[in-house]
Design a protein with these regions (language model features):
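Short coil/turn connectors at secondary-structure junctions
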Residues: 17-19, 42-45, 51, 79-84, ...
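Conserved donor-nucleotide/metal-binding helix-loop-beta segment in metal-dependent transferases, i.e.
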Residues: 57-95
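Catalytic-core segments of class I nucleotidyltransferases/pyrophosphorylases
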Residues: 60-67, 75, 79, 108-207
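Conserved catalytic core of nucleotide-sugar-dependent glycosyltransferases
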Residues: 96-110
Length: 214
């Protein structure tokens, strides 16, 4: 950080005062296993943000850009209901086989199918990598152990809350753009979108894109 500040690069200033801890997951055992590694640093309910899923606002002009409020909305929902919740996004029938697909009733998730075929999908609403987990998460992850459930451990956690009628659905609307950077084209789109939001790049990039489209 210091070398950047000394050169007048202040774009990381919003991180001032935030303490960050890193844990390295040396074995690919899934999300539940990764969360368990941070057990000693977490107290109470907490947000889970999957870094390969980028949620931001849709925009038609640079001046209309606003930061995403998805995490804030999850916190507000939890404070109102005291129940865990997951953000979901309508991906259309052609993409359901890439994600966990849910059905909903009265604001709650009632079923969850992991990467179904289009014929078996209960809906077109996908889990999009943004959650608010409850304080009982670690006890439940020990109950649904990684040794028994492997990488699907975190799915069993969600299903437990779902069976209790406690898993809320936070439905994202068209004001939110979701980029799944695990897909090469989605990753490229996210980079272009980000650059178009940057005043130092936007005009030249738009001009270059127009030229390439001619």
């Amino acid at each position: 950080m210091y070398p950047m500040y000394s050169k007048g690069k202040n774009h990381l200033n919003p991180l001032d005062g935030v303490e960050v801890f890193f844990h390295t997951q040396y074995e690919q055992k899934g999300l539940g296993h990764a969360i368990m590694m941070a057990k000693d640093k977490i107290q109470g309910p907490f947000l889970v943000l999957l870094g390969d899923n980028i949620l931001t606002t849709n925009h038609s002009a640079l001046t209309e850009f606003k930061p995403s409020t998805v995490s804030k909305e999850l916190v507000e929902r939890y404070n109102a209901t005291q129940q865990p919740c997951a953000s979901v996004y309508d991906v259309g029938i052609d993409r359901v086989s890439n994600y966990g697909i849910v059905s909903m009733q009265d604001g709650s998730i009632t079923s969850l199918v992991e990467k179904p075929t289009s014929a078996d999908a209960p809906s077109t609403f996908a889990l999009c990598g943004r959650y608010l987990y409850a304080a009982d998460t670690f006890d439940l992850l020990e109950q649904y152990s990684v040794e028994e459930y492997g990488e699907l451990q975190s799915i069993e956690l969600l299903r437990h809350w779902m069976r209790q009628g406690e898993l809320g659905a936070h439905l994202l609307d068209a004001s939110v753009a979701w980029y799944d950077s695990g897909l090469p084209l989605e990753w490229l789109k996210s980079q272009i979108d980000h650059a178009l939001r940057r005043p130092e790049y936007a005009q030249q990039l738009r001009q270059w894109l127009d030229e390439r489209m001619d």
